[in-house]
Amino acid sequence: MNYNQPATLQAAILDWAGTVVDFGSFAPTQIFVEAFAEFGVQVSLEEARGPMGMGKWDHIRTLCDIPAIAERYRAVFGRLPSDDDVTAIYERFMPLQIEKIAEHSALIPGALQAIAELRGMGLKIGSCSGYPAVVMEKVVALAETNGYVADHVVATDEVPNGRPWPAQALANVIALGIDDVAACVKVDDTWPGILEGRRAGMWTVALTCSGNALGLTYEQYKALPAAELERERTRIEQMFEGSRPHYLIETIAELPAVVRDINARLARGEMPQGN
C-alpha cells in the first residue's frame, strides 16, 4: 500500500478564547490577576498575558518563575513559590474562572459565518483549549446558546501534556477520524497553540488581532488608527516568529480564504512539514 498525501483539508482545529469566543481573551487574563491578588501578590494584565495558551496550572507556574513576580511572592511569604504554592493559586483561580466565564462568552464577529463556510468545504471542526474540562463544560454550553457547536472538544487536563505539546491537537485527529495530520489546520491566537499545531505536523494559522496578543475589545480594535494597528500587527507578527505559523491573519473571519489557499497548495503537492 502506498502513501498518498491529502488533496484537501479535512479538519480545522480551533482554539476557543481569542479565536472563536472572547475577543481580546479577557476571561482568563483578568482572573489570573485576581487570583494572585488574593494572595497579596500583584501581577499586571501584561504579565498575565505572557504565557497565554498553556494549561492554567502551567501558566501560573510560568508566571511564578518570572523573577519580578517571584520576588513579590517572596516579599509576602518569605520564600519563592513552590509547586504546592502554584497549586494553591490554581485552586483559587478555578472557582473565579468558572464564576466569571460568562462575562466574556460572546462569539467573535464573523466566527459563525467562517465556521459555516469551512463546513461547506467539507471540514470537520475540532477544538482545544488551555482551560481544564470543568471550565470547558461551561464555555461549550455558553457557545452552544450562541450557535456554535464544535465536532470535538479537548480540554488541557484531558491529555498527559498540554500546549505547547501536540497532544490536544492529535486527540482531535483521532476522535474526528482524520487519516493524515497534514489534512488539518490548527488556528490559535497564542504561540503555544501554534507550536502545538506545528509539532502535530499540521498547517497553522496565527490570529494577530482577536486574541491575547493585541488584548483589546472588538470595539477598541476597530477604533485603532491605521498607523497604530500596523505597528501592533508588526509587533505581534514578530512575537509569533519563533513558532513559525504558516499564515497570520487578523481574525477568524479571514480563515476561509486561508483554507482555500491551503487546499490549492495541497493540490500542488505541498505539505505543512516542508514549509
Curated annotation (Swiss-Prot):
Active site residues of this protein: 15, 56
Cofactor: Mg(2+)
Residues that coordinate or bind Mg(2+): 15, 17, 189
An annotated Gene Ontology molecular function: phosphonoacetaldehyde hydrolase activity
Entry keyword set: Hydrolase, Magnesium, Metal-binding, Schiff base
CDD domains recorded: HAD_PHN
EC number of the protein: 3.11.1.1
Gene Ontology CC: cytosol
Source domain of life: Bacteria
Family: Belongs to the HAD-like hydrolase superfamily. PhnX family.
Biological role: Involved in phosphonate degradation.
Assembly: Homodimer.
Protein name (record): Phosphonoacetaldehyde hydrolase
